[in-house]
Amino acid sequence: MHNHNKIANKELVVNWHITEACNYRCGYCFAKWGKQKGELIQDVASISQLMDAISGLPAVLNQMHAANFEGVRLNLVGGETFLNYRKIKEVVKQAKKRGLKLSAITNGSRINNDFINLIANNFASIGFSVDSVDNSTNLNIGRVEKNAVMNPEKIIHTIASIRAINPKIEIKVNTVVSDLNKSEDLSDFIGQVMPNKWKIFKVLPVVANHHLISEEQFTRFLRRHQRFGEIIYAEDNTEMVDSYIMIDPIGRFFQNSDFNNGYYYSRPILQVGIHQAFNEINFNANKFYSRYKRASLN
């Protein structure tokens, strides 16, 4: 099930979708599981057990792939990651106890001073999802809570506040390019934020049959922003397949191996163990590593 070619040293990035809950309703969000019961984030003992299991994952991959992963960066994603301060604080405590590095992806809308301090003092990296800075586009995408559309100025302010506490933190911007924002120019926003990385994804057909774009349209978006080529990491659909280690809210590995049939899942990690669960999904270690190359904008 796995690709066995040897790859270079790298920290292992594990994406844990801690919850499906979100205050936005983006139409092409891929973090949808039908509101499952039993999210591990709700239970302290389950969080602890999952952290133990994740700590052992580099050894599993090193054995299976003749790789040399040395540590784990636990990337917290949602849903929206920063909805419940108490629960995130518990995850931070458990992760740090085991020496795991932390990062997260957020829409930024609910980040208050408590979260700013927690992030700045405990996270190596924080990524903000920004697909558009245009109100009507964000409304069409679903980046809206009640009547409040995503506010780019709040994100700029939040990033400045986090950097003021921890100037060394890595700031990322994640952008999904779809039919709704393919013609937009985000240069002013990116120029203000000056992130360390700008990850640009082509919308996945696994979650949306509408709003899809062609390879040419995706390339045009990249070329429009080529002055940021040094920080852009672009991913088309092929590069995203089997190249992420993802855990769903109830503790199963899942993979987007086949765009036409949704996701493939392992059995729950806490039931069958990390080695067995990981064996039940596809993972391409070379693709994982090559995702970190910079996009070629020539």
From Swiss-Prot:
Protein residues bound to [4Fe-4S] cluster: C22, C26, C29
SS bond partners: none
Residue stretches making up the Radical SAM core domain: 8-235
EC number: 4.2.-.-
Transmembrane segments: none
Needed cofactors: [4Fe-4S] cluster
Family according to the record: Belongs to the radical SAM superfamily. Viperin family.
Protein name listed in UniProt: S-adenosylmethionine-dependent nucleotide dehydratase
